[in-house]
C-alpha cells in the first residue's frame, strides 16, 4: 500500500460517518431570583442612586419594555453590601469580581453538565472532548481545567477554553463541537456555556445609558450539551442534528457592541442601531445557509435566535417572518423567564424547544418542523448561523 493510500485509510478511520447530533441538554441558574418589576427600586437603592430620579424613571421604562419577567443572579443584596465598590459606576473592583466569578462560573457549569450527563445516560469516562465558554473569569488554569477536576473526567480529555466572547458563541460552541465530533470517530463532546454577570454589574451613569441597558437585560445561567456523531440508538437519543455552521462579521458594524476588561470590571458599549444592523444583514446569512437544502421560505423553519433584547427580535421577525411571532415563541419565553444570559441563551432556547415540542406532542423536536436555524449575535458585530435538523418525536 502506498503512503498516500495509507494516509487516506487512516484519515477515513478517524472520521465519523454521520453528522454531529445533540444527545443531551442540561441547564442551571443561581438560586437568587430577581423579579424585573421590582428591580429598578432594588438597583437604585443598592447603588445609593435613589436621588437620580429622572435616570431611575428611564431605567424603569427600560425594564418595562424589556419583555423580561424575571432573571437569576449570583449577586445578592448581601454580596453587594460586602463589595460596595461594585455598586459604584467606575470604582476599581476587578479583584473582588474575579474572586467571585472564577469560582461561580465553574460551579454553575458543573451543575448544568451533571444534568446533561445524567440525561445522556452514559459513563462520563466516554467524554473525549470539553469545550467551555464564558464571557468572564479569565484565569489559569482555566474553567475547562477546573470543570474537568470537578466532574472527575479523564485527565486525557481534550479541552478548549473560550473567554471574553460575549453573546454570540452559543453558536460558536456548536460549530466547534460539530467539527470535533465529525472528525474524531467515537468522540463525545461536553459543551458548557456558563455566564455570571458579577463582572459587569455597576451603578448607573447619566452619561452612559448603554451601560444601563445591560443592567436591565442580563442574567446568569449555564447550559451544557453532549454532542456526538453516529449515536448508538440503543443507548443514546439524538435531539437535533447539526447540519452546517457558519460565522460572519456584519458590514459597517465596527464598534456596535464592545466590551473592555478594566480595573472597574467589564464595561459594555452599545450603539443604538444594533437591531437595525442585524435585521438589515440577517437574511443573507439565512440564504447562504439554506441554499444547499433548497429552502427559502423562512416560515417553514423553526427559529432559535439569541435574544439580545426585544428590539432585535422584533426587527428580525419583521424582516424575515412578518406577522409570524410563533417562529420566536421559544426565544421570547426564555428572554421572559431568564433575561439575556449571553452565550448560554440559545442553548436554553434549544432545551425549551425540544421540551415544548414534547409537551405539545409535535411530530418533531423542532416544534413539528423538520429544519431550523440557530443564530448567535454579539461583539463584532459577529453572527453565528447554525442549521439544525430536528428528530422525529418517536425517537426523541
UniProtKB/Swiss-Prot annotation:
Which is an annotated Pfam family here? Answer: Chal_sti_synt_N
Q: In which pathway does it act?
A: Secondary metabolite biosynthesis; flavonoid biosynthesis
Q: EC number(s)?
A: 2.3.1.74
The enzyme's main class, written as a single word, is: transferase
- Give the UniProt keywords, A-Z: Acyltransferase, Flavonoid biosynthesis, Transferase
Q: Does the keyword S-adenosyl-L-methionine apply?
A: no
* Keyword hit for Cytoplasm: no
Gene Ontology biological process terms from the UniProt entry:
flavonoid biosynthetic process; polyketide biosynthetic process
Function, as annotated: The primary product of this enzyme is 4,2',4',6'-tetrahydroxychalcone (also termed naringenin-chalcone or chalcone) which can under specific conditions spontaneously isomerize into naringenin.
**Which PANTHER family would you find in this protein's record?**
CHALCONE SYNTHASE, HYDROXYMETHYLGLUTARYL-COA SYNTHASE
Q: What is this protein called?
A: Chalcone synthase
State the encoding gene. CHS
